[in-house]
Amino acid sequence: MIPQESMLVVLVKMIDLIPGPPVGPSKRGRPVTYPEKLFLKALVIMIVKHLHKVHELLSVLNEPTYEMQQLRGLLTENERYPTRRTWERRLKGLPANLPAQIGCFGRYLVELIAPWATCGRAVAIDSTVLRSKGGVWHKKDREKGEVPHSSIDTQAHWTKSGWHGWVYGWKLHIACVVASVWIPLSAELTSANAADNEIAPALIYELPPEALFVLGDLHYNAPNVYEVCEQTGRLLVTTQYGPYPHTDPGVEVRRIFHKLRSVAIENFNEHFKGIFDGHGQVPTKGLLNTQRFALGAIFVYQLALLYRFQHRLDLNIGLKAFIKAI
């Protein structure tokens, strides 16, 4: 009996068929032997198999199973398999390119799925907090430069969440489609103290050209965000400053937009965290490793959407079970 391909193998093969961001000019020095997509394939394996260190990935790939044999073949270029040092170096550099890849993939999904065919072309922009692994670095210790416990991730930081209070960790900044399907279009991961409006331009520049309305909360009511939206031909709709209840002429329209935004982004955030165990501490330490985990999870979410669209499956209901079962 010929064994069937696992769903993980199917998803990894799909990476060869999706578009990638424009390649920059060649750098001086030794030419690149392995394409970026080879390491995207490895990233998908890491996210699905809950592997967060390079040696864990290589140990699992070395297992003598049919699935691992197939995956090793997909991670080979011109009959060459990367060395351990190459894996470490290229996977360390992968987070820098993930926002552009996610943006490119998001635009491709919008083109295929056409989520705005029957509704307004709006995007919700927001950030969600992820708790750091290990202990927390209290302000008094940080100011003294003292790290009281080795479990503390010193690259994380504090933020105050309206829902969770003070949290030590990271912020996952996301823009997603406001429609019947929640498609992540762009993403960035920073330490938790990064201001939402400072990261917003990077998210907005990656949006599909069809996106007309950008819906945000009060944190995005900032001159730099308005400027970027104006440059890119979009309309920014945010909560306004001042005491409640607001009585200006646009308040009723803003309430409608705010409701649409809340339904889209809050559902996506909860869906995403439920799939990738984001309600507890992240499984990684350090900015680069956490970027690779969180942005890699967004990429896997996009890949799962593409598979389910191609096979005429529901794009919201059943997605969590589908990814968990891979």
Positions of PLM-derived features:
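Arg/Lys-rich, glycine/proline-spaced intrinsically disordered segments
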Residues: 29-30, 242-250, 313, 317-325
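Structural motif
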Residues: 27-37, 164-165, 283-294
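Basic, amphipathic alpha-helical segments enriched in Lys/Arg and hydrophobic/aromatic residues
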Residues: 255-326
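Basic, short loop/linker segments at the boundary and entry of helix-turn-helix/winged-helix-like folds
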Residues: 2-49, 90
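Helix-centered, glycine/charged polyanion-binding patches within enzymatic domains
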Residues: 218-284
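Major-groove recognition helix of helix-turn-helix-like DNA-binding domains
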Residues: 70-95
